[in-house]
């Protein structure tokens, strides 16, 4: 997908705001791993009310607009799956 200048980073979330929202109930960070449907994800529901789309993660994985969310984890706004393409070494290859 071609990135244009309009895409902003999704809201920060989780302990000390070290994660990013990946969906309304998903918060992930490189050091945190992923929270799904926990109190850490409550802030992510605010994304639904913001008018512009957002993007989290750097490396695409798994299709359907998903991207690497934490080492070994690939997330879309719908959920997360284990994905070896997202291992820490692969992120910086």
From Swiss-Prot:
Major subcellular location class: secreted
GO-annotated cellular components: extracellular space; secretory granule
Localization (cell): Secreted
The keyword Disulfide bond belongs to this UniProt entry's keyword annotation: yes
Disulfide topology: 10-54, 13-27, 21-44, 28-34, 61-74, 68-86, 75-80
InterPro entries linked: Neurhyp_horm, Neurhyp_horm_dom_sf
Alphabetized SUPFAM superfamilies for the sequence: Neurophysin II (SSF49606)
Any coiled-coil regions, as ranges: none
N-terminal signal peptide: none
Similarity comment: Belongs to the vasopressin/oxytocin family.
Role played: Neurophysin 1 specifically binds oxytocin.
Protein name: Neurophysin 1
Organism of derivation: Anser anser anser
